[in-house]
């Protein structure tokens, strides 16, 4: 899937990491119950993506948690004079792969819920999303266009 831009640098994003880009890059990550939020400013061609594991938690490891990841990403854009309303936001992941029920939602569902709540509280609309279900996802995020290519995985292929 990355053959479209074979000369661009590639980064593999692990759980609990993020990537902030001002230069064209292809960022790849694999999601199970984790979520990735992408943010892209079309004017400056600045982009960010996180791979958050849990809905919320202590602030010692910001990018492990959905809520603090989103806030920190926004702060990084705002520190460069980019306002939240300039951002195109996309949301991915949040599979419930380990037998969640309606009365006891899994961590994937909780990750998606928190992401949507924080984004709404910050006045951000989700332009595109592919969340939930029972299958993992592999993402290819093109930081110079904001485009995300997605491949759905069999349950055994997702590692988070």
From Swiss-Prot:
InterPro entries listed in its UniProt record: CheD-like_sf (IPR038592), Chemorcpt_Glu_NH3ase_CheD (IPR005659), Cytotoxic_necrot_fac-like_cat (IPR011324)
Root EC class: hydrolase
Documented EC number(s): 3.5.1.44
Sections of the chain in a coiled coil: none
Phosphoprotein listed as a keyword: no
UniProt keyword terms in alphabetical order: Chemotaxis, Hydrolase
CDD domains hit by this protein: CheD (cd16352)
Record GO terms (molecular function): protein-glutamine glutaminase activity
GO biological process: chemotaxis
Catalytic reaction(s) noted: L-glutaminyl-[protein] + H2O = L-glutamyl-[protein] + NH4(+)
Function: Probably deamidates glutamine residues to glutamate on methyl-accepting chemotaxis receptors (MCPs), playing an important role in chemotaxis.
Family under the similarity heading: Belongs to the CheD family.
Official protein name in the record: Probable chemoreceptor glutamine deamidase CheD 2
Natural source organism: Geobacter sulfurreducens (strain ATCC 51573 / DSM 12127 / PCA)
The organism's taxonomic lineage, starting at the top: Bacteria, Pseudomonadati, Thermodesulfobacteriota, Desulfuromonadia, Geobacterales
């Amino acid at each position: 899937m990355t053959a479209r831009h074979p000369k661009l640098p590639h980064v593999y994003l692990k759980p609990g990491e993020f990537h902030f880009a001002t230069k064209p890059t292809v960022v790849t990550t694999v999601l199970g119950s984790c979520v990735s939020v992408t943010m892209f400013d079309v004017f400056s061609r600045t982009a960010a993506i996180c791979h958050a594991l849990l809905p919320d938690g202590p602030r010692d490891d910001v990018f492990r948690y959905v809520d603090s990841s989103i806030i920190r990403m926004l702060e990084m854009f705002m520190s460069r004079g980019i306002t939240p309303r300039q951002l195109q936001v996309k949301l991915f992941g949040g599979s419930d792969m380990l037998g969640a029920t309606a009365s006891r939602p899994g961590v994937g569902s909780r990750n998606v819920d928190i992401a949507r709540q924080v984004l709404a509280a910050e006045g951000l609309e989700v332009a595109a999303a592919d969340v939930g279900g029972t299958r993992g996802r592999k993402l290819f995020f093109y930081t110079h266009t904001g485009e995300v290519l997605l491949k759905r995985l069999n349950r055994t292929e997702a590692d988070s």
